[in-house]
Each structure stands twice: as C-alpha cells, then as structure tokens.
C-alpha cells in the first residue's frame, strides 16, 4: 500500500505508534486485534527498525535465531526456518517482512514519515504528533517504539567536508552493495559493528587501518548452519521454552544457572569451565560459567584474564595483541561481542591497528584521518562509532505537554521512568523497552512482547472502567529510578564507561540505564503493579 493510501482519517485514531521495528509491529498487531484503531508512523521506507538501517558487512544478531523471534503465534514460529545458528541481518529483515506480510500490517503503516514533535493536550486527553513535512495526526494514546539503538553517532570532528573519499556509517549503511576491492579503508571504532565488519572488509580491501580508542571483549560466536535435528527439537518444545524464558535473567531459556563462585574452585577447574564455554560460543554461556562474574571483581578478573590470554594466543604480533586486550572494564560490563575471525584478521599483512587513545584523532583531512602523530591516507572511512543509545531517539522528538512538561528537561540529568514503560507528567505516553527496563540486557523480542502485552492490558483496563487517562505518580517513578540504580550498583556494570552508562556521548549524563535485576524479577513487578489496579499510576476519565 502506498503512503498516500495509508494517510486516511488521522483524527479517528485510538493509538499512534512510532516505529516499525519488532516492537512497533507487534503493538500494531496486538492492539488492532483488540479493536483499537492504531497506525504506525515510520521514518524508514519499510519495516525492520534496526535491521532496516544496519546493513553493514557481517551484521548479525548475538542472540540465537531460534530464540530471537516472535512467540505470539505458534504457526509463525513453527513455519519459519532459520538457516544459521545466529541470524544475519538480511535473514532477520526477511523474517520481519514476512511477519508484516503474514499479518497484513502494512495497510496501517505510513512509511517515510519522521516524527518531529508530540504534544499532549489535557483538555481532550489526546496526543498530537507532527511530522517533518508538517502533517499532524492525533490519538488518545501514543506508543513509542523508537528503539534503543536507532540514533547513530558520528564524532564532532573537523574535516568531514574536506575528505575526498567516501564516508559511511555502519548504522546508516547504504542499501546497495559496497565494494572495497582495491581500496584503503579506515574503520573507526571497535564495538560490535566494527568487530563484525572488519573481517569482511579485510577480505576485499587493499589495506585496512583500524582506529581503536577502547579495546572490547569479543568471544567466538561459533556460528554454523542450522542443524535440522536441533531446530526440530527446539520447535517441539517452543511453548515450554518461551514460558521458561520469563523465569531467567536474560529472557533466554536453555542455560542452566551456575551454582558455584569462580573463587570456590581451583584454577584448573575454573579454566576448564571457561574453556568449555569458549568452545561452546555465545556470551550468555560464558557469563554463566560461575555465579559471581558480574558481581565480584576478583571473580571477574579470572574470566577477563582468560579471555585476554585467548587474544594473546590468537594474535601473532604481541604488541597488537596487547592493544586488543581490554583492561579498562570487567568482562561482561560492556555488551559482549560475538565474532567470526575478528582477532585472526590482525594476522593479515594488510591490516593495521592504530591506538587512538595514545594518539587521538584530530579530524579528517583531504587525504584521510589525522591523529596527533600521523596522517593516514584512505579511500574510504567507515564510522563504527555506535549510537546515542536508549534515550537518543526519544530526545530527538520534541515531546511535551500543555502543562509544561518537556522530555529534554525531564531527562536532562538522565532518564526517569516508571517500569521503563511510562513517565510521570506525560499521560498516555507509553514506551516499548524504554530506559530502566531489561530491554537491551535481554532477548529483545521477548521484552518487546512483554511490554506490548502489558500496555494492551492497561488500555483494556482503562476501556473497561470508562477511563481514558493514565500517568505514573512522581513517587512511584522516583522509587523505580532509585531501585534501578540500586540494582545496578550491586553489580560491576557501573565500572565500565559503556553506552549503558551513556559514556560514549560527550556531555550525556552518566547513569546506568538498563534494568539488570533480571527478566523474571522485572516481569513479576510489572504484573504485580497491574494486579493491584495499576499501583503507582493515577487513572482518570
């Protein structure tokens, strides 16, 4: 359906949904089936969210395919076949498109529509959103499905207009194929997108220069073609596994919880456990080796050093190996990266690593990248510099109420939410996997489904009681923020300058944004709030 056909009777909407990623699509499906007049507004030209924009070489999910999928329809989860253990971006995007087609969602999606502002009127309890083209539409409720990693960050360096070569960002990758053959390519950043793309870029490029400020831990994914017997066994118990996932810390079933401290076993036993997890592949498996890897620094040191020794054993040049060894954060306190041949790539003669912590980048020049001690001549620069995570997309929209509440002021010192779903002073505005919810520290699709189901139940409660307005109480929000901080402070997570803390964005407040009390504890809290008549919320006509 064309955008013109989708633009119909905007004032009759019950729910406006912003974003057509996995959260937005499920919200549309769920609410539409309950009889709500809902529509999605999406900046991109099609569905997919992060999987639409992130098309860089090697882009792949770090959650296994059989888990990273919707559970709301059994026929859907039985019929779709995943080709690999970990889904690559093209396959995941195919899956999301299949979901949109199977449930006829596109007829209620307006693409190529970027939301500029959202304003709430207390007079009629309605949100009015305005697009960058000046179009306006209103609804009783607004659901922000804007994603946690959807606002790409590019450093504020001089010289972007001076560089004569090509510039790309992994988070805004072109839809056409990019050929690196014969090119001198610079990759800036060694987070997830850098680690995933560098080995593939190196297979084509004449020379690759990697600019690294901070080394990150990366584990082997051990990706492989999907084994038919594994898929069949998994699908045979899908319903049980999906239910069990809600009783785990990360929302993924199938990982028996550890029972011992890393400090209660011998060094030989400890290293054998790490070796087994390393061979198995996957981040959760490794962090599940012992009970205290994310809460005890001494215990974590053993896991961190094991990983560093793996880097030293893989990278032949020991100076390069040491530069690739992370020392400034405990393993797991930044998002663990999964890779295929990342460290092996540095053994290639045409791949160099530049330490820009000791010699920072000053900017771009006509020829390439200038650091404080050298200029590197390049034909292409790939920025793998991450995102303004968790809050960036929301703050790009001018969200305010006629009572004077503004999102910029609200989150000036860091995000404040109740349950990561709503905010005090912003009635009828819901978030899917917002800050202070498990979101990015969980199986994201499961968390999206849990939030959408909770929001749908909330709207049904309002409808059944003849009410139309809901907003968190300030005290409930304050208590939840304090709880989120206390839970994080009981772990090692705040020790890392991570995007979880907003540390990758200059001037962004340093506050740990995800909820790390676990999916099980979080869902129980959300369910208890609802069961108590939406405790902590003010509900009115």
Please place each PLM-identified region on the residue numbering.
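N-terminal FAD-binding dinucleotide-binding subdomain shared by FAD-dependent oxidases/monooxygenases
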Residues: 2-15, 20-160, 176-177, 190, ...
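Active-site proximal beta-strand in glycosyltransferases
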Residues: 161-167
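Active-site glycine-rich loop that binds ribose-phosphate moieties when present
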Residues: 170-172
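Glycine-rich NAD(P)-binding loop of Rossmann-like domains
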Residues: 177-184
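Ligand/cofactor pocket segment of small-molecule handling proteins
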Residues: 198
């Amino acid at each position: 359906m064309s955008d013109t056909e989708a633009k119909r009777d905007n004032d009759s909407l019950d729910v406006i949904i912003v974003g057509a990623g996995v959260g937005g699509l499920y919200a549309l499906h769920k609410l539409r089936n309950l009889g709500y007049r809902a529509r999605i507004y999406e900046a991109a030209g099609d569905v997919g969210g992060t999987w639409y924009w992130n098309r860089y070489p090697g882009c792949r999910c770090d959650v296994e395919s059989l888990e990273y999928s919707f559970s709301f329809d059994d026929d859907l989860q039985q019929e779709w076949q995943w080709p690999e253990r970990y889904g690559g971006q093209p396959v995941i995007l195919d899956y999301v498109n299949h979901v949109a087609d199977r449930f006829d969602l596109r007829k209620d999606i307006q693409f190529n529509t970027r939301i500029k502002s959202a304003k709430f009127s207390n007079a009629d309890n309605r949100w009015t959103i305005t697009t960058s083209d000046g179009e306006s539409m209103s609804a009783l409720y607004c659901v922000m499905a804007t994603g946690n990693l959807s606002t790409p960050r590019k450093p504020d360096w001089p010289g972007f207009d001076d560089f004569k070569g090509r510039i790309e960002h992994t988070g805004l990758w072109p839809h056409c194929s990019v050929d690196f053959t014969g090119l001198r390519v610079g990759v800036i950043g060694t987070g997830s997108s850098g680690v995933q793309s560098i080995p593939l870029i190196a297979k084509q490029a004449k020379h690759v220069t990697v600019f690294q400020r901070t080394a990150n831990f990366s584990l082997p994914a051990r990706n492989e073609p999907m084994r038919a017997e594994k898929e069949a066994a998994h699908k045979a118990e899908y319903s049980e596994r999906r239910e069990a996932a809600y009783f785990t810390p990360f929302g993924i079933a199938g990982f028996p919880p550890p029972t011992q401290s890393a400090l209660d076993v011998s060094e030989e036993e400890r290293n054998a456990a790490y070796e087994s997890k390393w061979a198995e592949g996957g981040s959760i498996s490794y962090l599940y080796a012992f009970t205290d890897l994310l809460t005890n620094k001494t215990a974590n040191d053993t896991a961190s050093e094991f990983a560093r020794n793996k880097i030293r054993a893989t990278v032949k040049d020991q100076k390069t190996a040491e530069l690739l060894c992370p020392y400034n954060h405990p393993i797991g306190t930044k998002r663990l990266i999964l890779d295929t041949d990342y460290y092996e790539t540095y053994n290639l003669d045409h791949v160099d690593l530049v330490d820009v912590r000791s010699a920072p980048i000053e900017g771009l020049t006509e020829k390439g990248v200038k650091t404080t001690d050298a200029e590197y001549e390049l034909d292409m620069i790939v920025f793998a510099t991450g995102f303004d995570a968790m809050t960036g997309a929301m703050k790009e929209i001018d969200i305010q109420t006629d009572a004077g509440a503004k999102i910029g002021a609200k989150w000036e010192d860091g995000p404040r939410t109740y349950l990561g779903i709503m905010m005090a002073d912003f009635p009828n505005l819901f978030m899917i996997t917002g800050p202070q919810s498990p979101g990015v520290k969980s199986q994201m699709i499961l968390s999206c489904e849990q939030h959408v189901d909770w929001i749908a139940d909330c709207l049904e409660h309002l409808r059944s009681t003849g009410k139309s307005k809901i907003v968190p109480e300030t005290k409930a929000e304050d208590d939840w923020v304090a709880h989120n901080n206390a839970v994080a402070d009981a772990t090692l997570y705040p020790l890392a300058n991570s995007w979880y803390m907003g540390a990758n964005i200059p001037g962004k407040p340093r506050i740990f944004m995800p909820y790390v009390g676990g999916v099980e504890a979080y869902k129980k809290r959300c369910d208890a709030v609802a069961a108590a008549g939406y405790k902590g919320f003010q509900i009115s006509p």
